[in-house]
Swiss-Prot record:
It holds the Pfam family Sir1. The lineage of its organism: Eukaryota, Fungi, Dikarya, Ascomycota, Saccharomycotina. This is Uncharacterized protein YEL075C.
Length: 122
């Protein structure tokens, strides 16, 4: 990895950087939006390996069935060893439910606003 890129990782406070890159999956979740704003990204295809259950990057030798089941992600490519690449994908931190209402999976029909015109102000 380039020294300048490593500095960007450090600046973005991606504390789990080393442990994330030691993960066996090729696709690694990264909660730092700063990285994705400062390092060039690319779109790559991934698939879930049926034998190991790991997420792997689609390569030239990847089988046709795995290519059909693949999905695309916007990633940052990181060299972690000799001929070994990991791909970081942005995943937001889990929301803090203690600070506000619990989000719903149901779509919103619109805003329900109560106008002050309906109330008499005394």
């Amino acid at each position: 990895m380039k020294v300048s890129d490593r500095r960007k990782f450090e600046k973005a406070n991606f504390d789990e950087f080393e442990s994330a890159l030691n993960n066996k999956n090729d696709l690694v979740h990264c909660p730092s939006i700063t990285l994705f704003e400062s390092i060039p990204t690319e779109v790559r295809s991934f698939y879930e390996d049926e034998k190991s259950g790991l997420i792997k990057v689609v390569k030239f030798r990847t089988g046709a069935m795995d290519r059909k089941r693949s999905f695309e992600k916007v990633v940052i490519s990181v060299m972690v060893g000799k001929n070994v690449k990991k791909f970081l994908t942005f995943v937001e931190d889990e929301p803090d439910f203690q600070g506000g209402p619990i989000p719903s999976n149901k779509p919103r029909d619109g805003l329900h606003v109560v106008s002050s015109a309906y109330f008499e102000i005394q």
